[in-house]
Amino acid sequence: MKITMIGAGYVGLVSGVCFADFGHDVVCVDKDEGKISALKKGQIPIFEPGLDHLVASNVASGRLNFTDDLKTAVAASDVVFIAVGTPSRRGDGHADLSYVYAAAREIAANLQGFTVVVTKSTVPVGTGDEVERIIRETNPAADVTVVSNPEFLREGAAIEDFKRPDRIVIGVDGSDGRAREVMTEVYRPLYLNQSPLVFTTRRTSELIKYAGNAFLAMKITFINEIADLCEKVGANVQDVARGIGLDGRIGSKFLHAGPGYGGSCFPKDTLALVKTAQDHDTPVRLVETTVAVNDNRKRAMGRKVIAAAGGDIRGSKIAVLGLTFKPNTDDMRDSPAIAVVQALQDAGARVTGYDPEGMENARKLIEGLDCARDPYEAAAEADALVIITEWNEFRALDFDRLKSTMKTPLLVDLRNIYRKDEVAKHGFRYASIGRPD
């Protein structure tokens, strides 16, 4: 099938290249001429394991192309996916849908023959209705069906998630079966591998995405609050998480205590769901609390580091390892590291950071951050070493080397990737999350 992907950002690029790898002819469209030029040269604007190889192989096969010419791409398409950004609207937390609606107008003006227009971006309930209204207002003669098909990709594992999904949710309204047939064909390689296609209404599909992300965010926030309680009563949050996670009704995923959730999805999607519910006079109190607790969590982690370092860090050097919101990505959006570093700086410390992939973005987002080339350069003459993001390369640190270069051998482990006895034998003081120290 001929597919156009509007938006060559994270979701659009990963989805487009995976569709091409399925054998479809895919054109990724973006208004950013610099981005398109770079992609044509094989320069990938984001870090995602395996993405560069997959782009190169599908470009070489002729199945994947990049352009800023939306008109030509849309006119030749069977399916057009809208995968543009939906950031939180400045000031009120609602999702900013201006890019989605602008894309809908441009798509409408260039449709030729029957076309399925799909919202792949995460959008509030009812957005598909407005996209359809815009298309029909712009081009009353258009033979089009608007479909919702939310993405469920985890940054750092997006290709695996796309090719081996737990489910594929497709929201289709009306009695015209053509869109259902088209979407089944688009996902045929996965359907043949028995990945379940969940067909539902458009509005239900849109809500599934928000409800799923909100539930996972609540699960993270729950275990973080349990971790705080563990510290007060002398319990171990990792054992608590294992003990409840083995219950099949609960499951073990997203029960890892830490500095709070961040990234491009959970913060904005929980906030957007809260606003949608308030607009319909049906507040979601659990999600409201999740948002508030998580915001405070990030700042509290800064205070935890300060307390571990003796309560006064004025003039101290603090080294932080891991700046992205999670491992295996260069995404700094709403990363807990931002709030932690700012809290340390506000308390008078000089902060030096290292991240395997996030340094370029960190420089843009964290003013006054000193940047190191590796963990040991970051730790030189440091009064404390803080692990914020659990990159694999931080799981086997040379503590003897660290001790020889640090001013004070103190490790504050905000991801619980070490045990106290492991680091104490090297002469380090150790603080972690939700465990007896």
Swiss-Prot record:
Active site residues according to the UniProt entry: 265
Catalytic reactions of this protein: UDP-alpha-D-glucose + 2 NAD(+) + H2O = UDP-alpha-D-glucuronate + 2 NADH + 3 H(+)
Residues that, per the record, bind NAD(+): 11, 30, 35, 86, 122, 155, 268, 333
GO BP terms: capsule polysaccharide biosynthetic process; UDP-glucuronate biosynthetic process
UniProt keyword terms in alphabetical order: Capsule biogenesis/degradation, NAD, Oxidoreductase
Any one GO MF annotation of this record: UDP-glucose 6-dehydrogenase activity
Statement: the UniProt record of this protein carries the keyword Transmembrane: no
NAD in keyword set: yes
Binding site for substrate: 151-155, 209, 213, 254-258, 262, 326
The enzyme's E.C. designation: 1.1.1.22
Pathway info: Nucleotide-sugar biosynthesis; UDP-alpha-D-glucuronate biosynthesis; UDP-alpha-D-glucuronate from UDP-alpha-D-glucose: step 1/1; Capsule biogenesis; capsule polysaccharide biosynthesis
Pfam families in the cross-refs: UDPG_MGDP_dh, UDPG_MGDP_dh_C, UDPG_MGDP_dh_N
Entries under InterPro entries matching the protein: 6-PGluconate_DH-like_C_sf, NAD(P)-bd_dom_sf, UDP-Glc/GDP-Man, UDP-Glc/GDP-Man_DH_C, UDP-Glc/GDP-Man_DH_C_sf, UDP-Glc/GDP-Man_DH_dimer, UDP-Glc/GDP-Man_DH_N, UDPglc_DH_bac
UniProt record similarity statement: Belongs to the UDP-glucose/GDP-mannose dehydrogenase family.
UniProt name for this protein: UDP-glucose 6-dehydrogenase
